[in-house]
């Protein structure tokens, strides 16, 4: 705790960064009142296959906001990238898009007039797939760029108002997309695992190092952060082992003068921002629950994506 507080107090003074810590309870809220709130008859899930750079197809679940309330567009859009592993498949994406498991995020943006795209990306070898390749290998980063290009060119989407929200490993992807797609409106990294984005080396056996003592690669950090133009929002919980790394991510963005905010939520477990995703989590005694902090983070995220700053 002492080490973390030192990091917190130190980075809170950075000129271009902003860190806020949120309190709140750890009770499990009933989640069913927050899901299935948008008519699937009026806003059906469109199962979409997007051709990737190498000819394979990327699954995406797309929903448009209600025309009875929002008209026919063009609409702003939020593209959401899930956590590990890549290659979840269409059924999983559709379930998330509908809020079938209790997570409120996807439908909340739909309620506010956003085209919500829940997109997949390829899995595979961690080190090969989760950073750009210099050998021509098509990676998850290429898939993310392809999805953004597809969404930006949809006739009912406002091209200049497309944002990305990535969680966990999807947060690593989101940061690479912030670096490589300057036309994005805003980028949100929820409980991100920016291991490759920051040049952190895995252990020789492929396992994750102690992230509280992680050593970043300064050259990789500079190269990846320098091109970023849009504001970035980072969300993490105090019970998440990735918190030290996410503080480092905030610090590095702030050092390079980027517009970045870090919001830290008491009691937040890894991926708490999405609530129940329908996953078996042996690391969580109560399983995936909807925390008060998740709802606070959701409304904060919605406000940020509307007006990034």
Where in this protein do the model-derived segments appear?
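Short beta-strand/loop motif that positions the catalytic acidic residue
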Residues: 228, 234-236
């Amino acid at each position: 705790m002492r080490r973390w507080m030192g990091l917190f107090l130190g980075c809170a003074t950075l000129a271009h960064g902003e860190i806020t810590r949120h309190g709140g309870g750890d009770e499990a809220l009933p989640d069913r009142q927050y899901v299935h709130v948008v008519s699937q008859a009026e806003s059906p899930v469109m199962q979409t296959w997007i051709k990737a750079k190498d000819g394979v197809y990327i699954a995406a679940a797309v929903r448009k906001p209600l025309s009875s309330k929002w008209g026919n567009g063009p609409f702003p859009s939020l593209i959401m990238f899930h956590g590990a592993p890549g290659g979840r498949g269409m059924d999983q994406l559709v379930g998330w898009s509908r809020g079938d498991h209790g997570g409120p995020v996807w439908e909340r943006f739909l309620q506010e007039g956003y085209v919500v795209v829940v997109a997949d990306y390829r899995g595979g070898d961690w080190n090969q797939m989760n950073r750009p390749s210099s050998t021509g290998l098509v990676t998850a980063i290429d898939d993310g760029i392809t999805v953004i290009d597809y969404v930006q060119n949809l006739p009912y989407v406002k091209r200049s108002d497309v944002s990305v929200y990535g969680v966990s490993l999807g947060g690593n992807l989101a940061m690479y997309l912030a670096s490589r797609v300057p036309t994005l409106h805003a980028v949100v990294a929820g409980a991100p695992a920016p291991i490759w984005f920051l040049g952190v080396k895995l252990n020789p056996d492929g396992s994750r190092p102690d992230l509280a003592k992680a050593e970043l690669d300064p050259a990789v950090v500079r190269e990846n952060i320098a091109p970023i133009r849009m504001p970035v929002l980072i969300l993490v919980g105090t019970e998440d082992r990735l918190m030290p790394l996410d503080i480092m991510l905030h610090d590095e963005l702030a050092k390079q003068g980027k517009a970045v905010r870090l919001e830290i939520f008491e009691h937040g477990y890894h991926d708490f921002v999405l609530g129940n995703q329908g996953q078996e989590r042996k690391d969580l005694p109560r399983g995936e629950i909807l925390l008060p902090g998740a709802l606070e983070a959701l409304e904060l995220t919605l406000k940020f994506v509307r007006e990034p700053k």
